[in-house]
């Protein structure tokens, strides 16, 4: 298998178009998109969040995901055989927010709507769309959890994290399914992280 590296800014339509054009030139088709770009924002009260920060999070987490899905759908509809699979990276924050996370939480709720709309609108074209909601995978984004993170009750506590390889395995299993089968939503998280009952 050949790897193709294409630097891109998912928040810019032209950059996304170039990314998918390069993909089509290199491989001739697109079978799976893992829609994974995302970022957070500083944990501050709502009234202190700069609108520029809000827009940056929305541009990456929602607009970027839309632009990548849109480009993938164009390819998947046009190719023969038609179809493919889109896996959107949601978050457990699509179900239960953390304190002071309005921008991130709002975009992850919106990703769920994006996933459902793609599933409905693209079903006639053999395009399956699912979402994986990840909680506390051990990445750079979650390193701060080892030192303690703000909880809904105002306390700060360490939270367990899981090996990100387990997430990769879950995504690979979703991607491997035949197109007549779909995991619509999957939640994967560190077993003892505060999620059920959070808040």
Enumerate the predicted regions with their spans.
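Residue(s) in the substrate-gating loop at a strand-loop-helix junction
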Residues: 91
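The beta1-alpha1 cofactor-binding region of Rossmann-like NAD(H)/NADP(H)-dependent oxidoreductases
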Residues: 7-19, 51
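Active-site loop immediately N-terminal to the catalytic Tyr-X3-Lys motif
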Residues: 47, 96-102, 159
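Alpha-helical segment proximal to the catalytic Tyr-Lys
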Residues: 74, 120-121
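Active-site helix of classical SDR
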Residues: 69, 107
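Substrate-binding pocket helix/loop in short-chain dehydrogenase/reductase
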Residues: 44-46, 53-58
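C-terminal helical subdomain
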Residues: 131-132, 151-197
């Amino acid at each position: 298998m050949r790897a193709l590296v294409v630097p891109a800014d998912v928040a810019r339509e032209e950059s996304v178009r170039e990314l998918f054009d390069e993909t089509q030139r290199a491989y001739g088709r697109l079978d799976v998109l893992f829609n994974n770009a995302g970022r957070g924002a500083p944990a501050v009260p709502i009234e202190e969040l700069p609108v520029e920060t809000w827009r940056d999070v929305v541009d990456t987490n929602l607009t970027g995901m839309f632009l990548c899905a849109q480009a993938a759908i164009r390819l998947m509809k046009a190719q023969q055989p038609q179809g493919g699979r889109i896996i959107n990276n949601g978050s457990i924050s699509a179900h239960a927010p953390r304190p002071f996370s309005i921008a991130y939480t709002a975009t992850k709720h919106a990703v769920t709507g994006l996933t459902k709309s793609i599933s409905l609108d693209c079903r006639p074209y053999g395009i399956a769309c699912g979402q994986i909601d990840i909680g506390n995978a051990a990445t750079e984004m979650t390193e701060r959890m080892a030192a303690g993170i703000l909880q809904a009750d105002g306390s700060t506590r360490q939270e367990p994290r899981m090996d990100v390889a387990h997430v990769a395995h879950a995504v690979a299993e979703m991607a491997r399914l035949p197109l007549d089968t779909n995991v619509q939503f999957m939640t994967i998280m560190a077993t003892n992280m505060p999620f059920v009952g959070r808040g």
